[in-house]
Amino acid sequence: MEFSKEYNEIDGLLVLTSPLHHDDRGYFLENWKKNDLIKFGVPEDFFDNDLQNNVSVSNKGTLRGMHCQGWAKLMTVAWGTFRMCFVDLRRESTTYKKVTCLDVKPGMAVFVPEGVANGAQSLVENGILNYIVTGYYNPNEKYLGITPLDLKLNLPWDMSTTPIISEKDMNSLSYDEVIAILESDVK
């Protein structure tokens, strides 16, 4: 597998690229291989967790996030382009409160460490996002999140159309409220 690693601004957030092999049928991609991911910085213990694989298919403009469920994630795009934004919420991190955004396409994998909030917006109709998380989703559990349209964060979402956002995400806490919770050690 021919991975390359790109620089990013948040400690532990990895952006990896792998070539797409095109022919008359379309393309083939080795999405990920455990040994290569470890070689490029994904912690080996990521694979020791109760892993759950999720797939979301999103209409153009759909904005999911900013989620911080306390899991690490390995995110790949199966179809389309997603604008992804990340906020480091790990108080012990040298990049605490740092924000970075990038457009992710097929052939790219993003490893999101536990404690880094993340959101994704589909820039195409029927964008397909695949992600592996280190915990099982429980719909009855309240997870930490930041409203994706937080004015202080002012994330560079595509606003050429009205974003489609779930009520739950829209009603998430503000960035300042989440920081206050984290800095008071109250969860």
Model-derived segments and their meaning:
Residues 1-104, 126, 135-141, 146-187:
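Non-catalytic, conserved peripheral segments adjacent to functional cores
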Residues 103-125:
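Conserved metal-binding segment of the jelly-roll/cupin
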Residues 131-132:
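Catalytic Cys-His active-site segments of thiol-dependent hydrolases/isopeptidases
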